[in-house]
From Swiss-Prot:
GO terms for biological process: ribosomal large subunit assembly; translation. Keywords: Ribonucleoprotein, Ribosomal protein, RNA-binding, rRNA-binding. One of its GO terms (cellular component) is ribosome. This is Large ribosomal subunit protein bL20. The keyword RNA-binding applies. The lineage of its organism: Bacteria, Pseudomonadati, Thermodesulfobacteriota, Desulfuromonadia, Geobacterales. Coiled coil: none annotated. The keyword Kinase does not apply. It comes from Geobacter metallireducens (strain ATCC 53774 / DSM 7210 / GS-15). CDD domains: Ribosomal_L20. The gene is rplT. One of its GO terms (molecular function) is structural constituent of ribosome. InterPro entries: Ribosomal_bL20, RIBOSOMAL_L20_CS, Ribosomal_protein_bL20_C. Binds directly to 23S ribosomal RNA and is necessary for the in vitro assembly process of the 50S ribosomal subunit. It is not involved in the protein synthesizing functions of that subunit. It comes from the Bacteria.
Length: 117
């Protein structure tokens, strides 16, 4: 079996990691071993935080809806309960956007929820 020289493949693999580490401070962008650790950690954080982002946005929407619904004399849970009973299928993202951009429209939706409680 002939000898395999892997210089090109190894260099390409290292350069790929160093390219991902571009912009990191100090040795983390220059030395392969430090760059590998930094890139692995960064990719792990990125994977985890793509999931956390969804939770954070949902919590933000709920906070905004709660603040707007309390201005209309309802708690968040009562508002959602009333909307479910009234078969209003507006998700929390849209409700939060309405609460911020169109308070008058949100108060109309809140009045629909109030009638169902």
């Amino acid at each position: 079996m002939p000898r395999v020289k892997r210089g090109f493949k190894a260099r390409r693999r290292r350069n790929k990691v160093l390219k991902l580490a571009k912009g990191y401070r100090g040795a983390r962008s220059k030395l392969f071993r430090s760059a590998t650790e930094a890139v692995d950690r960064a990719l792990n954080y990125a994977f985890r935080d793509r999931k956390v982002k969804k939770r954070d946005f949902r919590a933000l929407w709920i906070t905004r809806i709660n603040a707007a619904s309390r201005l209309n004399g309802l708690s968040y849970s009562k508002l959602i309960h009333g909307l479910k009973k009234a078969s209003v299928e507006i998700d929390r993202k849209v409700l939060a956007d309405l609460a911020v951009s169109d308070p008058q429209g949100f108060s109309e939706i809140a009045s629909v929820a109030k009638t169902q409680i």
